[in-house]
């Protein structure tokens, strides 16, 4: 027979998600006045003497990256592709892996990873402000890659406590990456072209999320246990591309205070 959860109706869950998204949209629509906030930001910047570019340049996005900045942008975007290739392979295929390799019907492992990420977002932001985005992000990559590597040895009968600990590590590692990667991309922009750089980031991340289920599925058809090895390889490749990033970091608070 089929597992019990295979017969569940998921319509209520989707309905709740749709309702939450619609409520969020309504709140956003009636509480966020972007033109007003933009004017206030420009006025405050001018008052403090930190208005670095003209209104014309801001509107046209005319600011050009230097060669080194452009190289850093490409490396960051390559890293985004690589760690999304790794992480989303696991999130999209774990239910199949859990059933075929771990002998599990239904479990809360991915929920634990998400909960760990949510709890760690704020502390990670504080740490990033102290030691810089890049160092914090690199630590997150190591944590995520290590969790996936150890998980690749887990089999049916392995301790679920250990697996839950590994996914807690993965959740914290992923949160560390998420908190710091997008700001590193938009750090290279100016007011008028933040949208363009946001587009770069999401093009890279969504492209990876689109193709990695196909690639990981191909390797899992060959050998089902390849999922976590696949993810580990891509995550650690992202570590090496990030090593060469020289721009987009934040100045740690201590360094700022000493200026």
Q: How would you label these PLM feature ranges?
A:
Residues 120-133, 220:
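Helix-to-loop junctions at the C-terminal end of transmembrane segments
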Residues 189-201:
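Loop-to-transmembrane helix entry/capping segments in MFS-fold secondary transporters
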Residues 142-157:
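C-terminal ends and interior cores of transmembrane alpha-helices
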Residues 90-109:
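Short amphipathic helix-loop junctions that connect adjacent transmembrane helices
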């Amino acid at each position: 027979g089929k597992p019990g959860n295979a017969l569940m109706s998921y319509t209520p869950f989707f309905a709740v998600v749709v309702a939450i998204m619609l409520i969020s949209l309504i709140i956003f629509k009636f509480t966020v006045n972007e033109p007003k906030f933009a004017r206030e930001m420009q006025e405050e910047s001018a008052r403090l003497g930190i208005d670095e570019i003209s209104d014309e340049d801001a509107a046209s996005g005319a600011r050009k990256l230097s060669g080194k900045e452009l190289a850093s942008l490409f490396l960051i975007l390559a890293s985004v592709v690589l760690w999304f290739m790794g992480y989303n392979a696991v999130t999209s295929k774990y239910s199949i892996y859990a059933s075929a390799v771990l002998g599990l019907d239904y479990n809360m492992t991915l929920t634990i990873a998400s909960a760990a990420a949510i709890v760690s977002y704020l502390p990670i932001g504080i740490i990033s402000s102290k030691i810089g985005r890049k160092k914090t992000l690199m630590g997150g990559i190591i944590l995520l890659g290590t969790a996936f590597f150890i998980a690749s040895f887990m089999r049916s009968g392995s301790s679920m406590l250990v697996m839950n600990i590994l996914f807690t590590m993965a959740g914290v590692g992923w949160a560390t990456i998420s908190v710091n990667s997008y700001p590193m991309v938009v750090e290279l922009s100016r007011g008028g072209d933040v949208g363009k750089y946001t587009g770069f980031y999401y093009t890279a991340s969504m492209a990876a999320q689109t193709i990695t289920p196909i690639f990981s599925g191909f390797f899992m058809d060959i050998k089902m246990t390849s999922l976590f090895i696949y993810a580990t390889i891509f995550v650690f490749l992202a570590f090496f591309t990030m090593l060469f990033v020289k721009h987009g970091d934040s100045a740690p608070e201590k360094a700022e205070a000493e200026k």
